[in-house]
Swiss-Prot record:
Keyword entries, A-Z: Cytoplasm, Pyridoxine biosynthesis, Transferase
Family: Belongs to the PNP synthase family.
Protein name (database record): Pyridoxine 5'-phosphate synthase
Cited PANTHER family: PYRIDOXINE 5'-PHOSPHATE SYNTHASE
Site description Transition state stabilizer, residues in chain: E153
Active site: H45 (proton acceptor), E72 (proton acceptor), H193 (proton donor)
Keyword tRNA processing attached: no
GO cellular component: cytosol
Binding site for 3-amino-2-oxopropyl phosphate: N9, R20, G194, G215, H216
Residues that, per the record, bind 1-deoxy-D-xylulose 5-phosphate: D11, H12, R47, H52, T102
Associated pathway: Cofactor biosynthesis; pyridoxine 5'-phosphate biosynthesis; pyridoxine 5'-phosphate from D-erythrose 4-phosphate: step 5/5
Subunit structure: Homooctamer; tetramer of dimers.
Amino acid sequence: MAEVLLGVNIDHIATVRNARGTHYPDPVQAAFVAEQAGADGITIHLREDRRHITDRDVELLKKTIQTRMNLEMAVTDEMVDIACRIKPEFCCLVPEKRQEVTTEGGLDVIGQKDKVAAAVKRLSDAGILVSLFIDAEHRQIDAANEVGAPFIEIHTGAYADAKNEVEQEKEFHRIKAAATYAASKGLTVNAGHGLTYHNVQRIAALPEIYELNIGHAIIGRAVFSGLTAAVADMKTQMRKARR
């Protein structure tokens, strides 16, 4: 079985920096360290309120990342304009609410199909591979396929936040079924949100999963063990799942 890829989300390096309005820690340096430790790509979310990653970060990271940039963004004209100018390798369209602490759910592709389709077309025409961050629902997968996105990213938050084993098992099987269904439609399947060192292996073991995007758990561990070790440890957990 092919190795599952790891996209390291470095948003929270910027969160720490912005908490004091300093120039450090720098997400550009974090991306370099993560890549050296085995990250297959770097994920950043340029939010409309610029609460962590800034336009400056996006510009510099595009010039310095040695692997692949995955730019998460809302479905807005401003963000599509930025992406078409920067030209990251990947864009992941996500829902966004100003008052949320983190992304709370998947993108409702069905409810805004025309808007999403237009964004997908503009990004694709610019040579960018597009992913849609959606819940593990067949109807949303069908809609993602219909608007022309080649990738989806399954929202794993409900699985990660499950209160007990029964609930987690139910959510795992939803993700598993969604991954199988999406792959049968010809979509490439990524997953992410809330994954940790303790719950990542079951998701990484699913043969349809191409890449996992993980940030908070890695940055949290990095506080105590360093970013190099934190990224390497996550890669180890993911590799174990594919043995």
